[in-house]
């Protein structure tokens, strides 16, 4: 269930739920626009998490952009003591932001190729290229199938040579795939069989 992020830029927050257990993927903020004059930022309504209390097994972050981590403090207020998983850089951003708000959180490192258990969910982090390094897609095993959550990504080379999307580590047999899409100006073009050409 999406708490935000559908049909809009930002507010990325999606809940996977099985019986009495749930997992939150991303906790992003939205930004003011011409339809919201005077508003700088917007956060998802985390009342759904608050109602579930300790059944929230984990918050898993795909990358360190504000539209994916900016509302984490509010998610943790709704579901205190929930472990937060993310890549090293993402957790660095999160740690600083939470410290500014006086929030002590259980932050846990996600490493591509090393799955983690969160209740009935098994999360497989997969490296993806994006405009911020250390970005992840997630293959999430549930009791009824595998859900592929891409986070933001691009299918061209990332800012660092080793930050390419690991297409070999995708989720074969995934039951569902969820992927945000936002229009972006291309920074390079990739052609099958021809390598990379910068524009």
Stretches with model-predicted labels:
Residues 1-60, 65-199:
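His/Asp/Glu-rich metal-coordinating catalytic cores
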């Amino acid at each position: 269930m999406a708490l935000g992020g559908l049909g809009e830029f930002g507010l990325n927050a999606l809940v996977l739920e099985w019986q009495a257990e749930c997992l939150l993927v991303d906790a992003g903020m939205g930004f003011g626009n011409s339809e919201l004059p005077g508003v700088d930022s917007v956060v998802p309504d985390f009342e759904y998490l608050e109602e579930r209390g300790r059944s929230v097994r984990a918050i898993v972050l795909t990358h360190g952009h504000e539209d994916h981590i900016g509302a984490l403090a509010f998610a943790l207020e709704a579901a205190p003591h929930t472990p937060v998983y993310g890549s090293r850089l993402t957790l660095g951003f999160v740690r600083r932001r939470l410290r500014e708000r006086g929030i002590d959180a259980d932050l846990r490192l996600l490493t591509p190729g090393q799955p983690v258990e969160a209740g009935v969910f098994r999360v497989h982090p997969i490296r993806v290229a994006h405009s911020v390094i250390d970005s992840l897609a997630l293959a999430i095993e549930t009791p009824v199938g595998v859900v592929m959550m891409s986070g933001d990504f691009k299918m061209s080379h990332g800012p660092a040579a080793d930050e390419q999307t690991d297409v070999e580590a995708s989720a074969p047999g995934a039951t569902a795939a969820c992927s945000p899409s936002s229009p972006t100006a291309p920074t390079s073009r990739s052609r099958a069989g021809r390598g990379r050409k910068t524009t």
